[in-house]
């Protein structure tokens, strides 16, 4: 691979895009009313899925970071992506609270927890001269995700229902993060 200054910007773009897509948990509340109404779940039981997601995301972060160092950031992202997109896809079939907790809370949470710590350190290694700015810009990607995707998700929920929307979003995440991961390469020693 020919390493140039453009390479680091390509890596940054991939990291920024993954941040945009994996910030989906920020608009998971859009699914509350349709799913609790359809299945008779309580709001608090539904909300616990988000808590489980965030706990799992944080708990698995160490594993994601360690794997990225051992096998490569890209491979770690792909493993996390399978869990993340798979969890969202299976959430589209969940008809009970335990299924919601396993598919969204544990599976999607574990996937997100593997993706982010594989991405951010990789971007920062490419930009030792701008680590603060790059970190902030990656975080901006996470903020743009809900801003861009919430209206799309709400439109899909209104047109095809919450469960089908979960499945559609899973496919979007699979494609989007898959493309983003292809842009991410480890920083060579001495860069």
Segments (PLM) and residue ranges:
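Pair of pore-lining "gating" transmembrane helices in MFS-fold secondary transporters
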Residues: 7-27
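Intracellular juxtamembrane helix-capping segments at the cytosolic ends
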Residues: 35, 105, 113-127, 134-135
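Residue-level signature of mid-helix packing/kink "hotspots" within the transmembrane helices
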Residues: 26, 54-62, 147
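Helix-loop-helix hairpin linking two adjacent transmembrane segments in secondary transporters
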Residues: 141-189
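Core transmembrane helices of Major Facilitator Superfamily
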Residues: 24, 107-119, 142-144
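Membrane-interface helix termini in secondary transporters
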Residues: 34, 65-66, 155
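Conserved MFS/SLC helix-loop-helix module at the cytosolic interface between two early adjacent transmembrane helices
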Residues: 59-98
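Hydrophobic core of transmembrane alpha-helices in multi-pass small-molecule transporters
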Residues: 20, 87, 98-114
């Amino acid at each position: 691979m020919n390493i140039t200054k453009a390479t680091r910007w390509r890596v940054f773009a991939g990291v920024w895009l993954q941040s945009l897509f994996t910030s989906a948990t920020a608009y998971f509340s859009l699914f509350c009313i349709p799913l609790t109404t359809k299945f008779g779940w309580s709001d608090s039981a539904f909300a616990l899925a988000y808590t489980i997601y965030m706990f799992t995301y944080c708990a698995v972060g160490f594993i994601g970071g360690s794997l990225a160092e051992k096998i490569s950031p890209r491979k770690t992202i792909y493993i996390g992506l399978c869990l993340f997109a798979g969890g969202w896809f299976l959430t589209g079939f969940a008809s009970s609270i335990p299924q919601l907790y396993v598919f969204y809370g544990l599976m999607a949470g574990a996937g997100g927890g593997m993706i982010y710590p594989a991405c951010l350190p990789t971007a920062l290694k490419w930009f030792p001269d701008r680590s603060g700015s790059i970190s902030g810009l990656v975080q901006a990607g996470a903020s743009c995700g809900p801003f861009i995707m919430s209206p799309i998700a709400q439109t899909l929920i209104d047109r095809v229902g919450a469960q089908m929307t979960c499945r559609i979003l899973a496919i979007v995440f699979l494609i989007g993060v898959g493309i983003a991961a292809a842009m991410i390469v480890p920083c060579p020693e001495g860069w």
